[in-house]
Amino acid sequence: MEFARFGRLTVSAGSPGLDDDVRRPTGDAGRMSDFAMSEAEFRALRERLRRASAWVPADRRGALNNITMSDVVAAAGDVRVGRTVSLAAPIQGPAADNPDPAVHQMAHSAEGPERASGLSFATDRLALNIHGDADSHMDALCHVLFDGTLYNGVADDTATATGAAELSIDVVSQGIAGRGLLLDIPRVRGMPWLEPGDHVTADDLLAAESAQADRISQGDLVFVRVGHRARRRSVGPWDAAGARAGLHPAALELLAQRRIGVLGSDSNNDTAPSAVEGVDFPVHVLAINAMGLHLLDYLEFEDLVALCEELRRWSFLCVLAPLRLPAGTGSPINPIAIF
């Protein structure tokens, strides 16, 4: 299959981490004209992915069906040194990319009037907008409504004002474990991060495979680094809702072919502005609505990158444990990579 349809892709000999026969976008490839996809092309792609990812009509697990018990056992067998690293960012305060921040309040503390001799407790409470542009979270399969349906043809009116009757985050109440694979796109391109508006193509994913001597396999928990957090630390917060790097919609075809289990990014997974005229969040539509693929948004990969570089390996056992929130459309998440 030809994956170079979107973006001017050229051989770049001598680029860090690239073989001469691996193509990557040239420096001007972030321009919208290079990557623009019509709505008709997008809808045709959505239908292909929907058909390719179909399970039985009653299925509610989606791409999680690609992760077998044998896959989990094999991933556990890859633990060699016993080191762990979090893939979540600290919960964020108010900023340009976080206009509706989490509210963390102390309910009881040593400063309160209830303080006395003997036993007392420090307690707190947390209120969080799960689907923002700052905090690490997992999207449930009920999160994306498109053309009147959720994943696998479930009617969108099952997502009610009181919660989701179908496809809620409770689908993953028993957790997810498997082989995690980090694909570090800035490393392959020889830059610290991708600029907002840049697109990760299927060719970028293939180049990362080659550079890291690893391959996206069935059931993998695939993590695509664009360097969002690194850029945020360097230049400061910006309105990520309007401008961010992410996957190009066409790259989902490769991930569907490989039958991955989960997809995550240190950004939103979707590029902004959208590459598809008239369709916002096209990657969310394709991944969640068409493929039944749980997404992890706004993760933190910088500690993970350092450990991967130190150990010279980019795969690991990964464990995801979302909150047990019946009828929830998502959950805060703290993925743990184990090496």
Q: Positions of the model-derived regions?
A:
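Extreme N-terminal basic, low-complexity initiation segments
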Residues: 1-15
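Serine/proline-rich low-complexity intrinsically disordered segments, especially terminal tails, linkers
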Residues: 14-17, 40
